[in-house]
Amino acid sequence: MAIFYKPSKGKNKSNVKGRVRGAGSGEKQHIVKTKQSWPSVDDINAANEAVTIDGMDWQGQGVARGDTLYFVDGALPGETVEIKALSSNKQIVNAKVTKVNTPSEHRQKPFCGVANQCGGCQLQHVEPQEALALRDDALKSMFQRKLGFNEGAWQAPVSGNRPRYRRKARLAIDARNPDKIKLGFRENAGKNIVDIEGCPVLVESLSQLIAPLKSAITGYASARLVGHVSLLAGENAVQVTVKHTRSLANDFIASLSQFAVEQNVNMTIEDGNGEFTHLHEIAPITCNTVDGFYLQPGPNDFVQVNAEVNTKMVAQALSWLAPKAGERIADWFSGLGNFTLPIANSGATVSAVEGVAEMVQRAKSNALEQGITNVDWMQLDLADEKSVDKALAGGFDKVLLDPSREGALTVCHALVRATPNTIVYVSCNPNTFSRDARVLIDGGYQMQKAGVVEMFPFTHHMETMALFTRQQQ
């Protein structure tokens, strides 16, 4: 790495800011650091020196190590790149690539024309298999460093087909000029909307709706009242939900209805109070899980965006959990029953706990419709220690956790006290997972298996799954 620092040799210990030194405008500048300060973003950018990337973190950022640790968006291992520093905190600099001097053999041209502006994807510049391999290795190294598990416990990653993997999306809208509407995703590190006609990572049934939907809402004053548009492709139909802040004019509603009829999709509008009006419905949306079961999400319910990888993920979780008839199993953060239904199909008695009351009722109704009666569905605040301890008081043989990005810290502390034999933890945030896993390990559990689930190709996000078993005392 070319950027370097020189400590001050003087005895003055005052906090003097770092500065850039150069003999003249034609000479290369170098950052000079005094003893108690680090160069500012402006200092780093003024130096305009290249860095060599020697690794990748689990989010897909290039890493350059030296006196300073650089995390560089858009850079790949082995590359020498010029950068723009975005933030600097002591020995850590966050930056983005401005020029690639020596490209990696794994660098590719993004397959989307707006990939460099759109905030939807961050990793189209690297071959997808290489991105998965590098990030898989980065996560394994991070977990080994923080959790100290046996390397042989690391499992092959779960992945699926690319690039059209997303069955769900939320489109932002800029209708300040109703005659020139922008419909798309927010730009990378900004608030502006990148206008699109289609999206190459959406399933085709969603991507092909974007252009006609924009036409349907262009020219209407009510378009200014739309906050966002949600799309969901089910097994049997497509759901379009338009979120609005105030009452929509009749002509705008009529245009949405006509669009739904012409495109043969479900159309729902949602007002500022969360009330839904169904303008057109082909059929209630269904999303398959495993063993022939399906979910029936409402317009705002959570479902995994990647249908193929979700099926593989559920199958692996079931294999690791190994539910059996007669066992008592807790499926917490259960949502609509993505894991619950196939677990219950084993004959085990299941406690399904979810924080959103509407999803609990929908999940229960859907389960009964499919003949599943051995589940106790419960709405519970899983961040409340007393409620969690009370719900665990009956005792469970096994537990499956699938929390949101905030993790399951309260639940993990409670599980250490409740001592179930087996825990399968599915996480969408490796940082909160490693925090929670440390609680379990310190509380007497051993991480037997762990691995990556590539739910979101081409993005910074990564899911993980781990199996914990209670150590014999």
From Swiss-Prot:
Keywords: 4Fe-4S, Iron, Iron-sulfur, Metal-binding, Methyltransferase, rRNA processing, S-adenosyl-L-methionine, Transferase. [4Fe-4S] cluster binds at C112, C118, C121, C199. Residues 6-27 are annotated as: Disordered. Residues 8-20 have a biased composition (Basic residues). Catalyzes the formation of 5-methyl-uridine at position 1939 (m5U1939) in 23S rRNA. The gene is rlmD. GO terms for biological process: rRNA base methylation. This is 23S rRNA (uracil(1939)-C(5))-methyltransferase RlmD. CDD domains: AdoMet_MTases (cd02440). S-adenosyl-L-methionine binds at Q304, F333, N338, E354, D381, D402. Residues 42-99 form the TRAM domain. It is an enzyme of class 2 (transferase). It comes from the Bacteria. Belongs to the class I-like SAM-binding methyltransferase superfamily. RNA M5U methyltransferase family. RlmD subfamily. Its EC number is 2.1.1.190.
